[in-house]
């Protein structure tokens, strides 16, 4: 447990740098209670989604609080690559971001800049907020940049063409395949398991690894998740809170269907 006057160490960022495989879960339910339950299940990371869920900033804060003491590092996906949105997420204590729909090296640089205090970036400087333990972390402003982890999503053919350039941007800690969006852009809308789409994902993984950059993916089907791990994906979300809940409750009801 981090002391009240200490800046938390970013365990996920260090694990990626050390080449450790990281298994995660997608969360969209948006409650601190569900996040607390999930964070204690043994996963390495949890993705708090604000792009495709009704989760707003106070709900992110509740989930960050709920995850304290668990095994999982919180990663927050902002709704867009927007410095104002990102600034607010960082001030409530987010240290890992998954930035959606990054199309170029310039957009990746903008994402990184939004997470860095001057002169390295453009993050607004507040004296007291949750991220610096309400002013108790005295060296927060000089150390915060180093603990930020920026992951960017590759979701289009254009982004694929720019993959190496995006990977080379200083401050980008990892790439992430958005399988549904990328499959849709490739002509396989609604079918991210199409063999041709999977082949593109595999090629992107190989290119990222050649560039020396960790790459992740969402794969809620166990067969797919294991295949992507074998391909060399560094961090994989193997399910979602909604999927786990839906499947469990439907299976439970089915066991009593004949009663």
Model-identified regions with their sequence ranges:
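Conserved anion-binding
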Residues: 84, 94-170, 181-184, 259
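C-terminal alpha-helical cap/extension of soluble enzyme domains
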Residues: 82, 123-136, 148, 154-158, ...
